[in-house]
Amino acid sequence: MKGNSKLGSPPWMTAEGMVDLTKLPIDFILKQAIDPEYKEFRSACVLLGSMASVGRLEAGLYLLGLLGWYASDLQRLEVIAEQLAHSPHGSSANALLAEIRRVRSSNTTRRYLDRVLRSLAVLPPHLVESGLEALAEDTSFSPKMRAKFFATVAR
């Protein structure tokens, strides 16, 4: 019995049997990204980040929306910030820079803010330099945080 061989491959499968992220349907991933189970959420965000890295603007846009949806969940925000590094768009840079201003540094938030800075460090310099320089010159941040902003600009 040949099963579904007459039906052919789905349009998002390549001839080599690989998934073409530029054609993969996104609906099920969007639902998974708001799943209460952390493992499901994380898997969806990683896939959205991969899709954004191959030019799927809608995947990056959804990640931006998740920043607001999970605004008080640092564990999930860390995953979202990590994946936004794969969305080289001005909106991603602006959202990550805004997170640094929104979330005050403390022992509880330090890990998340460090993740935001690591994501900013891999985005194209022309998207982040002026924002990071402005943060580095802002005396409302501690000298330690300002040094981190300068170090990120220098990368």
Predicted regions and their residues:
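Structural signature of alpha-solenoid helical repeat scaffolds
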Residues: 36, 68-72, 104-108, 137, ...
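Structural detector for internal amphipathic alpha-helices that build alpha-solenoid repeat scaffolds
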Residues: 2-21, 31-54, 65, 75-89, ...
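Amphipathic alpha-helical scaffolding segments comprising HEAT/armadillo-like alpha-solenoid repeats
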Residues: 19-32, 53-68, 89-103, 125-137
